[in-house]
Every structure is written in C-alpha cells, then in structure tokens.
Amino acid sequence: MNKKLLLFSAFMAGASWTVQAQDLVLSEGQYYTDATQTTPYTGRYTEFYDDGMLKMELYLKDGRPEGTYVIYYPSGKIAEVRSYYHGIFHGEWRTYNENGQLIGLASYKEGQKDGPWRIWSDKGNLLYEMFYTAGKKSGVWRSWDEEGNLLSEE
C-alpha cells in the first residue's frame, strides 16, 4: 500500500497544470485566474487554432511570461521562439518561415534591443544586419539584395 501511495505522490508532484486563453483574464499585460484580478496565474499557458492545432505555448510566472515562448504556424511548425525574464523580452527572438528555415534573429536585454539583429531571405541569404546597445542603434548596419550584393552600409 505504501508503495502505491508513494508512486501516486511522485506522479502528482511531477504533474503540471495547463490553462488555455479562455481560462484566464488579461489585464494590463498580466494574466489572472479570475475576473476580480486578484490572483496572477503561474503555470503553463497554451492557445489553439480552431482546428485544434497548437498556436502558442509559454510559461507564466505571477501572470507574466517567463522563459521560452513558442508560436506555431497552423501547420504545426514553429514560427517564433522568444525568451522572457520577469515578463519582458530578454535573450534571443528567433523567427522561422513555414519551411522551418531561420529568417530572423534578434537579441534583447532586459526589454531593450541589445546585440545583433539579422534577417535572411527565404533562400537563406542575409538581407539585413543591425546592431543595438541598450536599445540604441550601434555599430555598422548593412543591407544586401537577394543575390548577396551589398546595398548599404551605415
């Protein structure tokens, strides 16, 4: 009997609760578990397309995004992967086309653009390269055409 109770307890400790958009109230950028907006939600959050395919998934801590935030195309392929810390952008933001190819890469630090930003064509050619430091333009910015010819350098 004790082994069954121990196994059940271990299973329940590992279980994670998930809510969907209709289960939460969004107010001023924070998700709550009730209409009185007194209890910020902590846990996994998901949204689905009308056909049941996963649209997005993220973890909320005290009602705000925390960690990895993934957005999907209706086909089920990943469209974007973002990183949050205490409800603000922090880390990489990757964007993919419907074929799964990386077409955008951006960096944030504590909610501000910080680091390299790159955009590629669907053919994989680099189109733009930009740099930011603490939200402000920095370094040399470049752009190329679809064939890889340099168009501008500032």
PLM features per residue range, with description:
Residues M1-V25:
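Bacterial Sec-dependent N-terminal signal peptides
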Residues W17-E154:
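Glycine/tyrosine- and acidic-biased, solvent-exposed loop/turn segments at the edges of beta-strands
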